[in-house]
Amino acid sequence: MRIAVPNKGRLHDPTLALLDRAGIGVEDGADRQLYADTVDPALTVLYARAADIPEYVADGAADAGITGHDQLRESDVDCVEERLDLNYGSCRLVLAAPEDGDVTAPADLDGATVATEFPTITRAYFADTTATPEIVEVTGATELTPHVEMADAIVDITSTGTTLRVNRLQVVDEVLSSSVRLFAHEDVHDDPKVQQVETALRSVLDAHGKRYVMLNAPADRLDDVKAVLPGLGGPTVLDVDEPGTVAVHAVVPERDVFEAISELKAVGASGILVTEIERLVD
Protein backbone atom coordinates (compact mmCIF):
# COMPACT_ATOMS: atom_id res chain seq x y z
CA MET A 1 0.00 0.00 0.00
CA ARG A 2 1.16 3.53 -0.76
CA ILE A 3 -0.01 6.53 1.27
CA ALA A 4 0.66 10.12 0.14
CA VAL A 5 1.54 12.71 2.79
CA PRO A 6 2.60 16.39 2.64
CA ASN A 7 6.27 16.78 1.74
CA LYS A 8 6.67 20.14 3.51
CA GLY A 9 4.75 22.98 5.12
CA ARG A 10 2.73 23.17 8.31
CA LEU A 11 1.15 19.72 7.83
CA HIS A 12 4.37 17.77 7.24
CA ASP A 13 5.73 17.35 10.78
CA PRO A 14 2.36 16.77 12.52
CA THR A 15 1.49 14.11 9.94
CA LEU A 16 4.72 12.17 10.43
CA ALA A 17 4.33 12.50 14.21
CA LEU A 18 0.81 11.07 14.04
CA LEU A 19 1.95 8.16 11.89
CA ASP A 20 4.71 7.45 14.39
CA ARG A 21 2.30 7.49 17.35
CA ALA A 22 0.07 5.11 15.42
CA GLY A 23 2.93 2.64 15.08
CA ILE A 24 3.62 3.49 11.44
CA GLY A 25 7.06 5.01 11.87
CA VAL A 26 8.51 6.51 8.70
CA GLU A 27 12.19 5.80 8.16
CA ASP A 28 14.50 8.77 7.73
CA GLY A 29 15.81 9.32 4.23
CA ALA A 30 17.55 11.83 2.05
CA ASP A 31 16.04 15.25 1.44
CA ARG A 32 13.87 15.63 -1.63
CA GLN A 33 13.11 11.93 -1.68
CA LEU A 34 9.85 10.87 -3.27
CA TYR A 35 9.29 7.65 -1.32
CA ALA A 36 10.06 6.51 2.20
CA ASP A 37 9.78 3.10 3.82
CA THR A 38 7.89 2.53 7.05
CA VAL A 39 8.21 -0.05 9.79
CA ASP A 40 5.60 -2.03 7.85
CA PRO A 41 7.21 -3.53 4.72
CA ALA A 42 3.79 -3.51 3.04
CA LEU A 43 3.33 0.25 3.52
CA THR A 44 5.24 2.99 1.69
CA VAL A 45 4.97 6.76 2.10
CA LEU A 46 4.82 8.98 -0.97
CA TYR A 47 5.79 12.61 -0.40
CA ALA A 48 3.85 15.20 -2.40
CA ARG A 49 2.58 18.77 -2.23
CA ALA A 50 -0.50 18.94 -0.01
CA ALA A 51 -2.52 20.38 -2.89
CA ASP A 52 -1.49 17.56 -5.24
CA ILE A 53 -2.25 14.64 -2.93
CA PRO A 54 -5.93 14.23 -3.96
CA GLU A 55 -4.89 13.93 -7.61
CA TYR A 56 -2.17 11.40 -6.75
CA VAL A 57 -4.78 9.21 -5.08
CA ALA A 58 -7.39 9.74 -7.79
CA ASP A 59 -4.87 8.78 -10.48
CA GLY A 60 -3.76 5.66 -8.62
CA ALA A 61 -0.25 6.83 -7.76
CA ALA A 62 -1.22 6.28 -4.12
CA ASP A 63 -3.97 4.22 -2.48
CA ALA A 64 -4.65 6.71 0.30
CA GLY A 65 -3.60 10.17 1.34
CA ILE A 66 -3.46 12.64 4.20
CA THR A 67 -4.17 16.30 3.46
CA GLY A 68 -6.54 19.12 4.31
CA HIS A 69 -10.27 18.95 3.66
CA ASP A 70 -9.88 22.23 1.78
CA GLN A 71 -7.46 20.61 -0.66
CA LEU A 72 -9.85 17.72 -1.20
CA ARG A 73 -12.71 20.08 -1.95
CA GLU A 74 -10.59 22.23 -4.25
CA SER A 75 -9.36 19.23 -6.27
CA ASP A 76 -12.98 18.23 -6.93
CA VAL A 77 -12.02 14.60 -7.57
CA ASP A 78 -14.97 12.25 -7.36
CA CYS A 79 -13.30 8.86 -6.94
CA VAL A 80 -11.95 9.32 -3.41
CA GLU A 81 -13.67 9.13 -0.05
CA GLU A 82 -12.82 10.69 3.28
CA ARG A 83 -12.19 8.04 5.93
CA LEU A 84 -11.23 9.93 9.07
CA ASP A 85 -10.97 13.48 10.43
CA LEU A 86 -7.51 13.58 12.03
CA ASN A 87 -8.31 16.65 14.14
CA TYR A 88 -5.29 18.82 13.40
CA GLY A 89 -4.40 21.50 10.89
CA SER A 90 -7.67 23.26 11.62
CA CYS A 91 -8.36 26.42 9.63
CA ARG A 92 -11.12 28.35 7.91
CA LEU A 93 -11.52 29.43 4.32
CA VAL A 94 -13.09 32.87 4.52
CA LEU A 95 -14.37 35.63 2.30
CA ALA A 96 -12.63 38.84 3.38
CA ALA A 97 -12.62 42.45 2.22
CA PRO A 98 -10.93 45.73 3.25
CA GLU A 99 -12.04 47.04 6.63
CA ASP A 100 -12.65 50.52 5.24
CA GLY A 101 -14.58 49.31 2.19
CA ASP A 102 -18.25 48.87 1.37
CA VAL A 103 -18.30 45.05 1.24
CA THR A 104 -20.21 43.67 4.22
CA ALA A 105 -22.02 40.75 2.58
CA PRO A 106 -21.44 38.38 -0.37
CA ALA A 107 -24.19 40.17 -2.34
CA ASP A 108 -22.04 43.31 -2.38
CA LEU A 109 -19.57 41.58 -4.70
CA ASP A 110 -21.83 41.19 -7.73
CA GLY A 111 -19.72 42.20 -10.72
CA ALA A 112 -16.65 42.69 -8.51
CA THR A 113 -13.35 40.79 -8.51
CA VAL A 114 -12.39 38.14 -5.97
CA ALA A 115 -8.83 36.78 -5.74
CA THR A 116 -8.14 33.31 -4.35
CA GLU A 117 -5.94 30.25 -4.41
CA PHE A 118 -9.14 28.17 -4.27
CA PRO A 119 -11.11 28.99 -7.44
CA THR A 120 -13.16 25.76 -7.46
CA ILE A 121 -14.42 26.24 -3.90
CA THR A 122 -14.95 29.96 -4.48
CA ARG A 123 -17.05 29.46 -7.61
CA ALA A 124 -19.16 26.85 -5.82
CA TYR A 125 -19.63 29.23 -2.89
CA PHE A 126 -20.81 32.15 -5.03
CA ALA A 127 -23.09 29.85 -7.03
CA ASP A 128 -25.23 29.70 -3.89
CA THR A 129 -25.38 33.49 -3.54
CA THR A 130 -26.95 36.29 -5.58
CA ALA A 131 -23.53 37.64 -6.58
CA THR A 132 -21.56 36.75 -9.71
CA PRO A 133 -18.04 38.14 -9.29
CA GLU A 134 -15.02 37.54 -11.49
CA ILE A 135 -12.80 34.92 -9.84
CA VAL A 136 -9.07 35.57 -10.25
CA GLU A 137 -6.71 32.72 -9.32
CA VAL A 138 -3.47 33.67 -7.58
CA THR A 139 -0.66 31.51 -6.22
CA GLY A 140 0.30 33.38 -3.08
CA ALA A 141 0.07 36.61 -1.08
CA THR A 142 -3.68 36.68 -1.68
CA GLU A 143 -4.18 39.13 1.18
CA LEU A 144 -2.25 41.81 -0.72
CA THR A 145 -4.45 41.84 -3.84
CA PRO A 146 -7.09 44.30 -2.53
CA HIS A 147 -4.34 46.81 -1.66
CA VAL A 148 -2.86 46.79 -5.18
CA GLU A 149 -6.34 47.13 -6.71
CA MET A 150 -6.17 43.65 -8.19
CA ALA A 151 -9.28 42.48 -6.32
CA ASP A 152 -12.19 43.84 -4.31
CA ALA A 153 -12.16 40.88 -1.93
CA ILE A 154 -10.39 37.59 -1.33
CA VAL A 155 -11.19 34.03 -0.36
CA ASP A 156 -8.27 32.73 1.68
CA ILE A 157 -7.22 30.39 4.47
CA THR A 158 -6.98 31.74 8.02
CA SER A 159 -6.11 30.01 11.27
CA THR A 160 -5.83 32.82 13.81
CA GLY A 161 -6.92 35.81 11.74
CA THR A 162 -3.63 37.62 12.37
CA THR A 163 -2.68 37.96 8.70
CA LEU A 164 -6.09 39.41 7.88
CA ARG A 165 -5.85 41.96 10.69
CA VAL A 166 -2.32 42.99 9.72
CA ASN A 167 -3.55 43.63 6.19
CA ARG A 168 -6.66 45.48 7.42
CA LEU A 169 -9.08 42.90 6.07
CA GLN A 170 -12.31 41.83 7.75
CA VAL A 171 -14.12 38.51 7.47
CA VAL A 172 -17.34 38.86 5.49
CA ASP A 173 -18.36 35.20 5.60
CA GLU A 174 -16.99 31.73 6.32
CA VAL A 175 -16.73 29.68 3.15
CA LEU A 176 -15.42 26.40 4.55
CA SER A 177 -14.15 24.89 7.79
CA SER A 178 -11.22 22.54 7.29
CA SER A 179 -8.93 20.10 9.07
CA VAL A 180 -6.63 17.29 7.98
CA ARG A 181 -8.30 14.10 6.76
CA LEU A 182 -7.33 10.55 5.89
CA PHE A 183 -8.90 9.62 2.58
CA ALA A 184 -8.57 6.79 0.08
CA HIS A 185 -9.49 5.81 -3.44
CA GLU A 186 -12.96 4.32 -3.56
CA ASP A 187 -11.54 1.18 -5.21
CA VAL A 188 -9.75 0.27 -1.96
CA HIS A 189 -12.75 0.86 0.30
CA ASP A 190 -12.57 -2.67 1.75
CA ASP A 191 -8.81 -3.16 1.46
CA PRO A 192 -7.50 -4.71 4.72
CA LYS A 193 -4.34 -2.61 4.74
CA VAL A 194 -6.28 0.64 4.33
CA GLN A 195 -8.57 -0.43 7.17
CA GLN A 196 -5.53 -1.29 9.28
CA VAL A 197 -4.06 2.18 8.77
CA GLU A 198 -7.41 3.80 9.57
CA THR A 199 -7.74 1.75 12.77
CA ALA A 200 -4.21 2.66 13.85
CA LEU A 201 -4.78 6.37 13.33
CA ARG A 202 -8.19 6.25 14.99
CA SER A 203 -6.65 4.56 18.04
CA VAL A 204 -4.39 7.58 18.58
CA LEU A 205 -7.32 9.99 18.28
CA ASP A 206 -9.48 7.92 20.63
CA ALA A 207 -6.71 7.89 23.24
CA HIS A 208 -6.38 11.67 23.21
CA GLY A 209 -7.59 13.31 26.40
CA LYS A 210 -7.89 10.02 28.31
CA ARG A 211 -5.90 8.47 31.15
CA TYR A 212 -5.57 4.92 32.45
CA VAL A 213 -6.24 4.74 36.19
CA MET A 214 -5.19 1.75 38.31
CA LEU A 215 -5.78 1.33 42.03
CA ASN A 216 -6.39 -1.06 44.89
CA ALA A 217 -9.62 -0.83 46.87
CA PRO A 218 -11.46 -2.69 49.64
CA ALA A 219 -13.73 -5.29 48.06
CA ASP A 220 -16.66 -4.10 50.16
CA ARG A 221 -16.30 -0.58 48.70
CA LEU A 222 -16.24 -1.75 45.07
CA ASP A 223 -19.65 -0.28 44.26
CA ASP A 224 -18.48 3.11 45.53
CA VAL A 225 -15.35 2.89 43.38
CA LYS A 226 -17.41 1.96 40.33
CA ALA A 227 -19.57 5.01 40.87
CA VAL A 228 -16.46 7.17 40.60
CA LEU A 229 -14.89 5.24 37.71
CA PRO A 230 -17.56 4.14 35.24
CA GLY A 231 -14.88 3.55 32.59
CA LEU A 232 -15.57 2.44 29.04
CA GLY A 233 -18.22 -0.21 29.53
CA GLY A 234 -17.40 -0.38 33.23
CA PRO A 235 -14.04 -0.68 35.05
CA THR A 236 -11.99 -3.88 35.01
CA VAL A 237 -11.90 -5.57 38.43
CA LEU A 238 -9.10 -8.02 39.28
CA ASP A 239 -8.49 -10.19 42.32
CA VAL A 240 -5.22 -9.63 44.20
CA ASP A 241 -3.36 -11.75 46.74
CA GLU A 242 -4.43 -9.65 49.69
CA PRO A 243 -7.80 -10.88 51.04
CA GLY A 244 -10.59 -8.35 50.91
CA THR A 245 -8.82 -6.22 48.31
CA VAL A 246 -9.39 -5.87 44.56
CA ALA A 247 -7.52 -4.05 41.81
CA VAL A 248 -9.55 -1.73 39.63
CA HIS A 249 -8.50 -0.43 36.21
CA ALA A 250 -10.43 2.13 34.17
CA VAL A 251 -10.08 4.59 31.30
CA VAL A 252 -11.01 8.07 32.51
CA PRO A 253 -11.28 11.42 30.72
CA GLU A 254 -8.25 13.52 31.67
CA ARG A 255 -10.47 16.40 32.79
CA ASP A 256 -12.07 14.12 35.44
CA VAL A 257 -8.87 12.70 36.96
CA PHE A 258 -8.24 15.51 39.46
CA GLU A 259 -11.63 15.16 41.16
CA ALA A 260 -11.67 11.38 40.77
CA ILE A 261 -8.51 10.91 42.83
CA SER A 262 -9.98 12.75 45.81
CA GLU A 263 -13.22 10.78 45.56
CA LEU A 264 -11.37 7.48 45.25
CA LYS A 265 -9.26 8.14 48.33
CA ALA A 266 -12.43 9.01 50.22
CA VAL A 267 -13.82 5.52 49.57
CA GLY A 268 -10.63 3.74 50.61
CA ALA A 269 -8.67 3.43 47.37
CA SER A 270 -4.88 3.23 47.60
CA GLY A 271 -1.91 2.78 45.29
CA ILE A 272 -3.57 4.99 42.69
CA LEU A 273 -1.58 5.13 39.47
CA VAL A 274 -2.46 7.38 36.52
CA THR A 275 -0.77 6.85 33.15
CA GLU A 276 -1.07 8.24 29.65
CA ILE A 277 -2.66 6.15 26.91
CA GLU A 278 -0.83 6.09 23.59
CA ARG A 279 -3.48 4.21 21.65
CA LEU A 280 -7.01 3.01 22.37
CA VAL A 281 -8.57 0.41 20.09
CA ASP A 282 -12.29 -0.06 20.63
Swiss-Prot record:
Summary of activators and inhibitors of this protein? Feedback inhibited by histidine.
> Which GO biological process categories is it annotated with?
L-histidine biosynthetic process
Which EC numbers does the record give?
2.4.2.17
Quote the subcellular location field of this record: Cytoplasm
Co-factor(s): Mg(2+)
**Pfam short name (any one):** HisG_C
Q: What class of enzyme is it?
A: transferase
Which cellular component terms (GO) are annotated to the entry?
Answer: cytoplasm
Provide the reaction this enzyme catalyses. Answer: 1-(5-phospho-beta-D-ribosyl)-ATP + diphosphate = 5-phospho-alpha-D-ribose 1-diphosphate + ATP
Q: Which GO terms describe its molecular function?
A: ATP binding; ATP phosphoribosyltransferase activity; magnesium ion binding
Query: What does the UniProt keyword field contain?
Result: Amino-acid biosynthesis, ATP-binding, Cytoplasm, Glycosyltransferase, Histidine biosynthesis, Magnesium, Metal-binding, Nucleotide-binding, Transferase
Give the pathway.
Answer: Amino-acid biosynthesis; L-histidine biosynthesis; L-histidine from 5-phospho-alpha-D-ribose 1-diphosphate: step 1/9
- Role: Catalyzes the condensation of ATP and 5-phosphoribose 1-diphosphate to form N'-(5'-phosphoribosyl)-ATP (PR-ATP). Has a crucial role in the pathway because the rate of histidine biosynthesis seems to be controlled primarily by regulation of HisG enzymatic activity.
What family name appears in the similarity comment?
Answer: Belongs to the ATP phosphoribosyltransferase family. Long subfamily.
Output the PANTHER family linked to this UniProt entry. Answer: ATP PHOSPHORIBOSYLTRANSFERASE, ATP PHOSPHORIBOSYLTRANSFERASE ATP-PRTASE
Protein name per its UniProtKB record: ATP phosphoribosyltransferase
